[in-house]
Amino acid sequence: MSVVGGRMVAMTNSAAVLADAAAYAAAVEEASLAAAAYYATGESALDDDAYDRLARGIAAYEADHPEEVLADSPTGKVAGGAAVGDVPHTVPMLSLDNVFSAEQFVTWTASLERRIGRPVTAWSVEPKLDGLAVAARYRDGRFERLITRGDGTAGEDVSHAAGAVVGLPERLAEPVTIEVRGEILMTNEQFAQGNAIRTEHGGAPFANPRNGAAGTLRAKDRAYRVETTFFAYGALPLPDSGELGEALAELPHSEVLAYVAGLGVHTAAGTAVAPLRATTVEEVQARVDGIGALRAALPFGIDGIVIKADLAADQQEAGSGTRAPRWAVAYKLPAVEKITRLLAVEWNVGRTGIIAPRAVLEPVEIDGSTVGYATLHNPADITRRDLRLGDQVMVYKAGDIIPRIEAPVVHLRTGDETPIAFPESCPQCGSEIDASEQRWRCTRGRDCRLVASVSYAAGRDQLDIEGLGSTRVVQLVDAGLVADFADLFTLRREQLLALDRMGETSTDNLLAAIETARTRPLSRVFCALGVRGTGRSMSRRIARHFATMDRIVAADAESLQRVDGIGKEKAAAVVAELVELAPLIGKLVAAGVSMTEPGATPPPDPGTEEAAAPATADAGAPGGDAATGSALPLAGMTVVVTGAMSGALEKLSRNQMNELIERAGGKSSSSVSRRTTLLVAGEKAGSKRAKAEDLGVRIAVPEEFAELVGAFLTAGEEA
């Protein structure tokens, strides 16, 4: 299977560097232990990439120091050699050598053709299944024995498990004596079902499908049944097979597979990655690429593609080494699992109130993307698997599958790991948690998210409704008075007076604050919607670009990309979310909430840019042309605010200062850089002022800045 010991490994060309004999000996021991665990249980202290780097390092050291090769080096062993049984194989069950790229594959084919002295005219291309290699013996068409690979010369008898192996019939279609070789694995569906059955019986879930297949195959006297699946990849005669033995020896590999399928044994023929016969290296590579593209959508795991010389004569001429045949190779695909560190656990609340844990990981590259988070099922699962902060964990990801933690690598624990703390109250709203089931739930259910969204909308940087904290929002939700924050604008005095601790004064004050919120500028109303990826600053930019909510809602992704800071992906996401928010926006309009941005002029309609006349607006007033911004005092400027404001700016929050900057045509920023045009520095300005001085950035005190943007201050105070 792999270059060393047949280990399933990732596509990589790097190797561990072993400086001396001691490092080599340690590497051999580590690789041997990892391979033993891998084939015995489906788990290992090394991920695929780490094992492969170690394996290549061992092979490189042995090539340079052949006199120092250790007897237990995995370079001379068949994969799975740790699980030795007492049933001899009639013909050794060998491993496969690996290639990791098109270039390496071409080199391998050239080597094979040199060895046999002629071109290979037929290739068999089939999926490399991520399971356990076994040999199934049939005598006179009846199942007799199931044997694991073991050390390649003898394996373990696991016949007791055959009854739960799909695709391995009790009786063949013909009364022949034959040995069928293949892989036993768990399909994705079997893995899910197996874990459900195990947890129902008080067991821990399998770490991964390979681990599940290994454990299931060796388990005896279970109180429950877990299914696996067999895929045949070859067949050979037994000593008393008679004429069949001679026939099998002459058949091309592709015809052997067809014969096995005709006997009623399961092969990959009925799958999207069915074995294919190719005549050129180019055809083989095309099939390799095709299988790789299908990998994520397959209902079972593969970790590569097996390529074999199809003709029996080519196989016989090429022969086999002590560990692998010379006429076949495994073309490995990128690893879909890696070991990394569990840094933290976040607790998130879904729309229905389900509290779900999410793992924060030390970023690691898996299957072509960087993974920093992984799903964790529920608190009970964390407890069962004894996950701890600081653990080295095996993380799985393939294609579009959400990354998940398979298991902690217990052997790598240092003693510094700490237990994961579970929340005592809802992390979203602070209410009690219903922990009676495996999936914990906020007792407020769907209302939990409602409390958070209404509280956010009423916050200081959004609608700024004074007196409407989360406690009051909980009251309103519990009383059934609000289903979204638009309902705040239809609250009646008598409804509020009926609530606990709501007297006449507090009621009138709240209603007055809500009435004021009705006049907030579009930027704040849009921010209150909570559109993902658009915070306060982005909301201001969107509002000033489009000027009205109607134009924002009507904008397509291309139009949104004209807003500074919005790319293609974010634009599409905003458009999609605005469609979902349309009913809420409609309620806000009906309630008389402001849907315009003071001082902003909408962009010209497509195709009318040249006809647009900038001078049509009063460029010297706050209502001037924001589309061009040419007459605004901060047009084209990037402004940073630091320190305590004074004078006319004293009562403005930092968010209000940023709004003021953007109303006056500028762009607000939180950090000083070479792009900064102006720093507004109040008392205790600190390091930002020092950096601005070093960079030669213009610095203004609050009073100077207030004079510069004086015409826009009134609009800011009203907001």
UniProtKB/Swiss-Prot annotation:
Location of region: Disordered: 596-626
Ordered alphabetically, the record's keywords are: DNA damage, DNA repair, DNA replication, Ligase, Magnesium, Manganese, Metal-binding, NAD, Zinc
Q: Where along the chain is NAD(+) bound?
A: D48, D49, A50, Y51, D52, S95, L96, E126, R149, E183, K308, K332
| Any one GO BP annotation for this protein | DNA repair
Tell me which cofactor or cofactors this protein depends on: Mg(2+); Mn(2+)
State the Gene Ontology terms under molecular function: DNA binding; DNA ligase (NAD+) activity; metal ion binding
Which Gene3D superfamilies does this one have? Answer: 5' to 3' exonuclease, C-terminal subdomain, 6.20.10.30, BRCT domain, DNA ligase/mRNA capping enzyme, Helix hairpin bin, Nucleic acid-binding proteins
Task: Specify whether Kinase is a keyword of the entry.
Answer: no
BRCT domain residues are 629-719
Residues that, per the record, bind Zn(2+): C426, C429, C442, C448
Pfam families recorded for this chain? Answer: BRCT (PF00533), DNA_ligase_aden (PF01653), DNA_ligase_OB (PF03120), HHH_2 (PF12826)
Instruction: Report the EC number(s), separated by commas if there are several.
Output: 6.5.1.2
Q: Where is the composition biased (Low complexity)?
A: 609-626
Is the keyword Transmembrane in the record? no
Catalytically driven reaction(s): NAD(+) + (deoxyribonucleotide)n-3'-hydroxyl + 5'-phospho-(deoxyribonucleotide)m = (deoxyribonucleotide)n+m + AMP + beta-nicotinamide D-nucleotide
PROSITE patterns associated with the record: BRCT, DNA_LIGASE_N1
Q: What does this protein do?
A: DNA ligase that catalyzes the formation of phosphodiester linkages between 5'-phosphoryl and 3'-hydroxyl groups in double-stranded DNA using NAD as a coenzyme and as the energy source for the reaction. It is essential for DNA replication and repair of damaged DNA.
Protein's name according to its UniProt entry: DNA ligase 1
* Gene that this polypeptide is encoded by: ligA1
